[in-house]
């Protein structure tokens, strides 16, 4: 049950160190906030994340710096978003094509314009997925909303998974759009869709496990959770019937440091046979790497 030192990793949630780009993305959430403290936060869930990595003053090669951090922890490849507020993803594509794969963050409120953008970017980048933050859209978009169905259909057509935040969101915005029970209808209607839950699915992690047992193309990634806070239901599922369904995802540099993540991973009680799948094999198969 010990962590396999030196094992290669695929990180399914990694960010490039562009503080201006990250803050510009966070600004899109602010119209949803009602409390004064949230409006003053530099990071949307700052009340939960106390030791956010410092990515200021990294010199003139921030992408190269990020690759060096990946090397420290045997991260072979990282999934990064094509951030409309930053140009660093272009640098990553042009200089480190063997280290980065891409997802396209979508706002389902955009309808077919978003679908066309997804298709265009899929030709320009090594796009292996799409992402949606239902509670962070403005207006919010529930997981089973008709606006989401357009995005799901496009992902099925492109044969890429969609990564969707599930459970109570960290930012202080209404939670209903991310209720895990809404995933049931989506997986029923789109049996071909590969759907990956992000950001915990709490407090409905037991329901998330039931749905993963029910639907073969439903997965769970550990994004935005320090390993010491991985839900017990998820660890138990990985150690029993779900070894092929649970995937490693970090949250660097948005909220967690790689040092903290990989230090705490050593205390996660996964069985020996689970670790290679969790860290690497499940992502490799899902993303067809």
Predicted regions span which residues?
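Mid-to-C-terminal alpha-helical segments outside catalytic/metal-binding sites
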Residues: 1-12, 19-72, 77, 242-247, ...
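Hydrophobic/aromatic residues located in beta-strands of well-ordered beta-sheets
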Residues: 9, 78, 100-102, 162, ...
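Active-site environment of divalent metal-dependent phosphoester hydrolases
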Residues: 17-19, 85-88, 109-110, 137-138, ...
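Short, acidic/polar
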Residues: 59-69, 110-122, 205
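Active-site gating/metal-coordination segments in enzymes
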Residues: 76-77, 83-170, 177
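Catalytic pocket-lining loop regions of alpha/beta-barrel enzymes
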Residues: 128-129, 142-247
């Amino acid at each position: 049950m010990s962590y396999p030192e030196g094992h290669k990793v695929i990180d399914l949630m990694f960010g490039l160190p562009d503080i201006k780009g990250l803050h510009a993305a966070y600004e899109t959430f602010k119209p949803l906030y009602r409390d004064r403290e949230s409006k003053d936060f530099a990071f949307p869930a700052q009340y939960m994340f106390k030791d956010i990595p410092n990515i200021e003053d990294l010199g003139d090669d921030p992408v190269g710096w990020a690759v060096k951090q990946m090397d420290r922890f045997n991260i072979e490849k990282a999934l990064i978003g094509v951030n409309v507020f930053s140009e660093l993803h272009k640098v990553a594509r042009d200089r480190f094509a063997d280290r980065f794969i891409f997802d396209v963050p979508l706002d389902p409120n955009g309808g077919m314009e978003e679908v066309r953008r997804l298709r265009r970017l899929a030709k320009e980048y090594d796009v292996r997925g799409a992402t949606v933050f239902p509670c962070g859209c403005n207006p919010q978009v529930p997981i089973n909303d008709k606006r989401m169905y357009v995005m799901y259909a496009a992902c099925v057509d492109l044969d890429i998974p969609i990564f969707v935040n599930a459970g109570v969101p960290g930012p202080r915005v209404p939670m209903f759009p991310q209720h895990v029970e809404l995933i049931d209808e989506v997986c029923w209607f789109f049996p071909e869709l590969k759907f990956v839950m992000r950001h915990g699915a709490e407090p409905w992690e037991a329901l998330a496990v039931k749905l993963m047992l029910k639907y073969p193309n439903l997965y769970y990634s550990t994004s935005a959770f320090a390993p010491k806070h991985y839900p017990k239901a998820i660890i138990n599922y990985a150690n029993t019937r779900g070894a092929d369904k649970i995937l490693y995802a970090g949250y660097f540099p948005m909220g967690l440091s790689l040092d903290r993540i990989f230090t705490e991973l050593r205390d996660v009680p996964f069985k020996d046979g689970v670790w290679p799948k969790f860290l690497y094999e499940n992502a490799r198969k899902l993303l067809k790497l």
